[in-house]
Amino acid sequence: MAATKVVLDNQDGPVILVGHSWGGAVITEAGNHPKVVALVYVAAFQPDNGETVLHWLQTFPPAPENGVLPPDAKGIVYYDKAKYHAGFCADISKEESDFMYASQGTFYAKGFTTPITRAAWRDKPAYGVVATEDKSIAPEIERSMYKRSNTKITEIKGSHVIYISQPKAVAKVIIEAAVNASKSK
């Protein structure tokens, strides 16, 4: 959150925050910044006040392809390499998948268990992309979160990395958020 706030503080104008996966929880909190005018959730979690990502993960059984492993002794979460392509990014090439696996950043489990204190989508326009072939976050979870928050929903056929496999369709949603934000000024 602190790094996101620094970036937002340094912007000259209005900001559209885009979050993917657990990054949806980040934009849900960071979106309270006064420069943020809209939120775009791309195959992302959208918790409410007091909720966690883990809460939502537990609302629907995981796909058999899902390869998220339990945290290690340091609290770091990894994805099972054998399930990575099918469970995370089945609609991109195996070469791209192998590169993504090798270059993934560190993710601490506390990101799944930290509750939201103030959900920005309660006060700001929100847009949600449901990745209909997502094996990491069940599309049913994405739809449930987005519907209860009155988020404008766009469904796109693709895996959890919909922003890579369907970049034009995802960009169209982000552009729509920006255009609508500029109209409401």
Predicted feature residues:
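Short, proline-enriched alpha-helix->beta-strand connector loops that line the catalytic pocket
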Residues: 121-126, 148-151
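Conserved loop-alpha-helix segment in the C-terminal half of the alpha/beta-hydrolase fold
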Residues: 132-157, 164, 176-177
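Active-site nucleophile elbow and catalytic-triad environment of alpha/beta-hydrolase enzymes
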Residues: 99-120
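Glycine-rich phosphate-binding loop signature in dinucleotide/nucleotide-binding domains
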Residues: 10-13, 177-182
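Conserved strand-to-loop "acid loop" that flanks and positions the catalytic carboxylate
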Residues: 39, 125-134
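Gly/Ala-rich beta-loop-alpha elbow adjacent to hydrolase catalytic centers
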Residues: 18-23, 27
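Active-site loop/oxyanion-hole signature of alpha/beta-hydrolase fold enzymes
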Residues: 1-16, 30-33, 54-58
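Flexible "cap/lid" loop of the alpha/beta hydrolase fold
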Residues: 32-36, 40-81, 111-112, 137
